[in-house]
Amino acid sequence: HAYLALVTDAYSKKIMGYKIDTNMKATLVKEALQMALKNRLYSHQNIIHHSDRGIQYCCPEFSDYAQNNGMLLSTTQKYDPYENAVAERVNGILKYEFGFIKTLPNLGVAKKMLKQAVNIYNNNRRHYSLDMKTPEFAHRNQQHEYKSYSLN
């Protein structure tokens, strides 16, 4: 089995960080978050990290790291996928449009596929909620208000 951690910008739908590995430990989600922080364009903006109630997000290793990097933590109130709709949508796209629903031969293949999928998703896949723009375009052009989210 392989486990995937994603950090997605809710405004632009851009996958900011990701990590795939054979375990679902706090280090998996922490490394995805580290990648996301490195990829930020707008370091002056506050970050709210929203996740489900998985133990890897609630443990001190992750929560301390996130808070030490100035993030507010938010979790779903119940175990309801509708409370984490952006994450569920991106997971579904990766599974069904990019082939992550099937069993892959090994972790190396999965990592290569994931890197390619994230690149295509961020730079080529247009979203109706982004006025048919790509996540990368929306992330770099935040003056526009899209259908799902607006800047505060």
Go through each PLM region and give its residues:
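RNase H-like two-metal-ion nuclease catalytic core shared by retroviral integrases
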Residues: 51-53, 59-62, 73-95, 108-110, ...
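Short catalytic-loop micro-motif centered on adjacent basic/acidic residues
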Residues: 19, 48-51
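Active-site beta-loop-alpha junctions of metal-dependent nucleic acid enzymes
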Residues: 18-42
